[in-house]
Amino acid sequence: MATDQPVTGSRPAWFTAALFGMIVPAVALVALASGPEAASLAVIGGPVLALGLMGAGMIAAAASGRLWIGVALALLVGAGFLALAKGLGLAGGVPPLATGAAMLIASVSFAVRGALFARSALDKGWWIAVFVVAGEAAILITAAAAPGALPDWLLALLPAQWANRSIQTALGGMGSLAAGSALIALAGTAAATLLVAALWPRRWPYVIMFSTWLALSALVYHYPAPPVGGSL
């Protein structure tokens, strides 16, 4: 899926994608891994990978107007973080299929939202993506650093948290089905968002998109993924 606009040459847009998608998560991973009480990869990797995939996928898709660019960049970022984690001695025994499936579904879901921002707001779409990423990242980091500080219903509304929990359970060796509700929510909202983008500028598909988001949030709330012990 592509917009009618050419790929933006805006340096701030691509710098922001690199900042949220690569620099901040990489620094966080190194800092957390080198701490006096380094947490397991399942605890660190979930929020870090979710932030990286969201920042790279959503902002890149919004900046370029190309869904595939967002997906490709997000997956490259995810692979890079796993390689970095391995170099730091954290990534022993990562389940490849479950982790890869969670990363792929999350990458597509984030990139579809970015592509919709590009289609609806044209060359300003990446600004919307930045604000969305910043807001979800703030809640994601708070939830990871202080478990229980935020209500479960709020976390159930966040696609970033869906990605976090699906990646956490995969890295923890629990398999994809353990976070089935989160994966279904990511895939379902991606499909609904893709429908809105495909039918733009018609506005009625937004009703389907928001209804799908609320319904799938309820699914995640009532059927949460099993917790992975520890905090950042």
Tell where the protein language model's regions lie, with residue ranges.
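Membrane-interfacial helix-loop-helix junctions in multi-pass membrane proteins
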Residues: 140-199, 227-231
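Long, hydrophobic alpha-helical segments
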Residues: 19-35, 39-59
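Transmembrane helix segments
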Residues: 124-154, 221-223
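Alpha-helical transmembrane segments of multi-pass membrane transporters/translocases
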Residues: 11-29, 173-226
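Central hydrophobic cores of alpha-helical transmembrane segments
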Residues: 73-77, 126-137, 157, 206-216
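Short, Lys/Arg-rich, polar N-terminal cytosolic tail immediately upstream
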Residues: 1-10
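Membrane-helix interface and helix-disruption motif detector
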Residues: 33-44, 63-66, 87-98, 120, ...
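Alpha-helical transmembrane segments and their short interhelical loops
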Residues: 59-123, 194-198
